[in-house]
Swiss-Prot record:
Ranges of biased composition (kind: Low complexity): 48-58, 645-663
Keyword Transport recorded: yes
PROSITE patterns to which the protein is assigned, alphabetical: PABC, RRM
UniProt superkingdom: Eukaryota
Key words, A-Z: Cytoplasm, mRNA processing, mRNA transport, Nucleus, Repeat, RNA-binding, Translation regulation, Transport
GO cellular component, as recorded: cytoplasm; nucleus
Organism: Pyricularia oryzae (strain 70-15 / ATCC MYA-4617 / FGSC 8958)
Any one Gene Ontology molecular-function term assigned to this protein's record: RNA binding
Start and end residues of each PABC domain: 664-741
Gene: PAB1
Covalent S-S links between cysteines: none
Annotated protein name in UniProt: Polyadenylate-binding protein, cytoplasmic and nuclear
Gene3D superfamilies attached to this UniProt entry: 3.30.70.330, c-terminal domain of poly(a) binding protein
Similarity remark: Belongs to the polyadenylate-binding protein type-1 family.
């Protein structure tokens, strides 16, 4: 809408704001209830929110939708935004590894008029209980980060939300973005931002609203200062401080005595002793403000550590809360890094321990490799019958004592153990959790222990011995492993289906400008991704090409480049009709395929990769399957890779000529790649997986991974001997069940995610 330009309108608004109550009127919302159900109910637009006109440099039909609940999907947004007009594409931006929503999306309309209408009628609409924030998408990061026309407002009442703030400031000019800062619980932090299209509008808003009352609170309105500029000013203030903080003050000291102590160093503008509100007693600290920095600095130098009324004072520059928190964070991080480096390479994590192994037995097992500083077997905490009357402090102390080594697993810290535990303490030990820690004095001894003790049988159980790692390191490794396996499965599925090489492109396309994240437009059927030198079809000005996941700058996330047909390898030859990726129903189906690919692990039905049937793709004739695929191509498991494809024979071939799992065919394949042990391992896995799947289908993938740690010659023998294979499968199941039980006990403080449970290697 056009901004009022006449002075009378602005003056009238100013007078209205003088005693405005932001809760006085009925709050206008568009109650769609999209998150609860897809009823297609008509949107209530009785009181549309004033919005800005489209940016002047170019017409745009692309909208940025922020403040979304993590569970909001493309289908939910399509249900809402399609009521305004024809939607070209919708993309919810997600994390590249976890595929979790980042809380914002992009909606592309076919016409700019529909985009303007959506911005006018749907801004601050409740989606799954949270008001969304809509603005025009700005692809140029330089324009987003200039800060021109950006206004900062503080001392806002907690009842003022995004819409109320927008309504208040919309009269001064076109608003590009409006936001009230919120905490993790959705409560207002008391400040917000309004981004105008022009500096003139921002100046008008500051002139007329700064110092006015909103909900009986006087607000401050000023130009937004970038963080780097604020930091430089803050550093200057720190160097020229006048306010000092004093602590360790005797409670008997009066205000006059406190002020007199500092007045001899210069002119004091104010002094204050902190007192308890109920009793009025001094809390032992206070503040003194001088007129000049030199006087304040002199007082700090001469009074710090000086005795006053029998107590040594602490006198220093007064710090803001965020400064103190930052210093504490840095000191904690430094201590943690020092602790981690101290035990780097010497602390071992041992699991799959027998219940009979105690601390002493664990020490004896590893003592042959060098001096041991500590050895600890983790155990459950127990409560003796006669301990019910113990104090709460005692119970918490015992709990902390038992949990301390468990935290060590995540923090790579040294297990604590007192030497020479008495018999009474031993009698109170709980059941072993099946894992423990051994800390050596020398890294070389620890390395030798890992090499010698890993997989050694102790009480008929193979030990797992490795260097202890912090929790965040293990999590990063697991995420990288999951991503690599999912990519490998997609490539294997494409190869098994006979997909030509030119159709198996990387998921991110780099355009002529070498800028990552640009996706090619939806081409004709059978058209592969453009290669170097091929021009991309220009899109509508201001609108993202279909399948391009735009990234709003400065949000701390990597570019989200997902091809239009993510979950399917490349684009397919023209062997039948195929749905266009712009179709929102197709986007919803592709999202299901993505989730199936990420949720499926080495075992379980979901682990069969994105090519598995069961997820219907809209637009396919009769759900018959993917064009150009053999009828059974989508039903193959993870083993259906290159080796399985090589083992298939034409339909008319004799039965004996088929089956990649036959020993003769297997030996031939192994001989062909004799110089590549990794490829041999892959062939053996493809051959052994169907046999294991017939024995135990639910954990076939996980058991296959466990058995692949064996030597290749042993694996060949297992392929040829079903009895030996079944025996090994039973052993692997026993080890896995024991591992699951130990993990449930040892890491119960934080249950692993579904991906971790499925993908973690036993």
């Amino acid at each position: 809408m056009a901004a009022p330009s006449n002075t009378a309108a602005v003056d009238q608004l100013t007078s209205d704001l003088a005693n405005a109550n932001m809760n006085g009127g009925e709050k206008t919302t568009v109650n769609t209830n999209v998150g609860a159900s897809f009823t297609g109910e008509e949107i209530d637009t009785a009181g549309p929110t004033p919005s800005s006109a489209a940016p002047h440099p170019q017409a745009s039909a692309s909208l940025y939708v922020g403040e979304l609940d993590p569970s909001v999907t493309e289908a939910m947004l399509f249900e809402l935004f399609s009521q305004i007009g024809s939607v070209a594409s919708i993309r919810v931006c997600r994390d590249a590894v976890t595929r979790r929503s980042l809380g914002y999306a992009y909606v592309n309309y076919n016409t700019t008029a529909d985009g303007e209408k959506a911005l006018e009628e749907l801004n601050y609409t409740l989606i799954k209980g949270r008001p969304c924030r809509i603005m025009w998408s700005q692809r140029d990061p330089a324009l987003r980060k200039t800060g021109q026309g950006n206004v900062f407002i503080k001392n806002l009442d907690v009842a003022i939300d995004n819409k109320a703030l927008h309504d208040t400031f919309a009269a001064f000019g076109n608003i590009l973005s409006c936001k009230v800062a919120q905490d993790e619980n959705g409560n207002s932090k008391g400040y917000g931002f309004v981004h105008y299209e022009t500096d003139e509008a921002a100046s008008q808003a500051i002139k007329h609203v700064n110092g006015m009352l909103l909900n009986e609170k006087k607000v401050y309105v000023g130009h937004h200062i970038p963080k780097k500029d604020r930091q430089s000013k803050f550093d200057e203030m720190k160097a020229n401080f006048t306010n000092i903080y004093v602590k360790n003050i005797n409670p008997e000291v009066t205000d006059d005595e406190f002020r007199t102590l500092f007045e001899k160093y210069g002119d004091v503008t104010s002094s204050s002793l902190a007192r308890d509100q109920e009793t009025g007693k001094s809390r032992g600290f206070g503040f003194v403000n001088f007129t000049s920095h030199e006087d304040a600095s002199k007082a700090v130098q001469e009074l710090n550590e000086k005795e006053f009324h029998g107590q040594n004072l602490y006198v220093g520059r007064a710090q803001k809360k965020h400064e103190r928190e930052e210093e504490l964070r840095k000191s904690y991080e430094a201590a943690r890094q020092e602790k981690a480096s101290k035990y780097q390479g010497v602390n071992l994590y041992i699991k799959n321990l027998d219940d009979e192994v105690d601390d002493e037995k664990l020490r004896q097992l590893f003592s042959e490799f060098g001096p041991i500083t500590s050895a600890k077997v983790m155990r459950d905490s127990i409560t003796e019958p006669g301990e019910e009357g113990e104090s709460k402090e005692g119970e918490e102390s015992e709990k902390n004592k038992e949990n301390k080594p468990e935290e060590k697993e995540g923090d790579d810290s040294k297990p604590e153990e007192k030497e020479g535990e008495d018999s009474k303490s031993k009698s109170k030990l709980g059941k072993s959790k099946g894992f423990g820690f051994v800390c050596f004095a020398n890294p070389d001894d620890a390395t030798k222990a890992v090499a010698e003790m890993n997989q050694r049988m102790v009480n008929n159980k193979p030990l797992y011995v490795a260097l202890a790692q912090r929790k965040d390191v293990r999590k990063n490794q697991l995420e990288q492993s999951i991503q690599a396996r999912n990519q490998l499965r997609m490539q294997q599925a494409a190869a098994a289906a006979g997909m030509p090489q030119q159709y198996m492109q990387a998921p991110v396309f780099y355009g002529p400008g070498s800028q990552p994240g640009f996706m090619p437009p939806a081409g004709g059927r059978g058209m592969p991704y453009p290669q170097g030198g091929m021009p991309m079809q220009p899109g509508r000005p201001g609108q993202f090409p279909a399948g391009f996941a735009a990234q709003q700058g400065g949000r701390g996330a990597m570019p989200q480049g997902i091809p239009p047909m993510y979950g399917l390898p490349g684009q397919f030859p023209p062997q039948g009709p195929f749905p266009q990726p712009n179709n929102p129903q197709f986007l919803a189906a592709m999202q299901q395929i993505q989730q199936s690919a990420l949720a499926g692990g080495r075992g379980g039905p979901a682990g069969r990769g994105p090519m598995q049937g069961g997820v219907p793709v809209p637009g396919m004739p009769g759900g018959a399957g993917l064009p150009g695929f053999p009828p059974n191509a989508r039903q193959q498991g993870p083993g259906a890779g290159r080796g399985a494809a090589a083992g298939r024979a034409p339909a008319g071939a004799p039965a004996g000529a088929r089956g990649a799992g036959a020993p003769e065919g297997l030996q031939g394949q192994l001989a062909a790649v004799a110089d590549n042990p990794g490829q041999q391992k892959q062939i053996l896995g493809e051959a052994i997986f169907p046999k294991i799947q017939a024995i135990h289908p639910e954990l076939a993938g996980k058991i296959t991974g466990m058995l692949l740690e064996m030597d290749n010659t042993e694996l060949v023998a297992l392929v040829e001997n079903d009895g030996a294979l079944r025996s090994k499968v039973d052993e692997a199941l026993a080890v896995y069940d024991d591992y699951v039980r130990q993990q449930g006990d040892g890491e119960g403080a934080q249950a692993p995610s579904k991906e971790e449970k499925t993908e973690e290697k036993a």
